[in-house]
A protein has these predicted regions:
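Acidic (Asp/Glu-rich) sequence patches and key acidic residues
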Residues: 1-152
Length: 152
């Protein structure tokens, strides 16, 4: 079954911009969103600013992607924790999010012999400690991209 997945850690706020978060943390994010930057119709506005560190490296299990992210962030846990708690006081916060697309035939597949098993993952004590220290939530988004049989 084709599987495309990635993980990211994000700080988010309706009041504090990603640039301000970067200044406070001293860490350059991989991606940012700006509140109101993806307006396609008057009703669609991102609800917050986001500062993200992302791992999209193919061929890694989710826990391996999360380890890559935390290897970058853990030296800054105290600053991330302080900022996350300030953001949470105004409705923002922190999240570690996992995004998985099952049956994603649009993604290039490795040869069957080379394809790693990407199913199954776990969070070790190191990850759980970081989530607890930073007050981050865990989000998991999973999508079945198989063609709808009724649409044929």
């Amino acid at each position: 079954m084709p599987l495309h997945q990635y993980a990211y850690f994000a700080l988010f706020s309706t009041h504090t911009s990603a640039d301000d978060m970067t200044s406070q943390l001293g860490i350059t994010p991989d991606e940012v969103t700006v509140r109101g930057s993806r307006i396609t119709k008057p009703a669609v506005i991102p609800v917050d600013h986001s500062w993200m560190v992302v791992c999209r490296e193919p061929g890694l299990r989710v826990d391996e992607q999360i380890t890559r992210i935390l290897d970058r962030l853990q030296p800054h846990t105290d600053r991330i924790s302080d900022l996350s708690r300030r953001l949470a006081s105004t409705g923002g916060g922190a999240v570690l999010n996992v995004v998985r697309y099952f049956n994603d035939t649009d993604q290039a597949e490795l040869g069957a012999a080379d394809a790693p098993n990407l199913f199954g993952w776990h969070l070790d004590r190191k990850v759980l400690g970081f989530l607890s220290a930073t007050g981050a939530e865990l989000g998991v988004d999973e999508y079945d991209m198989a063609e709808d049989e009724d649409a044929r």
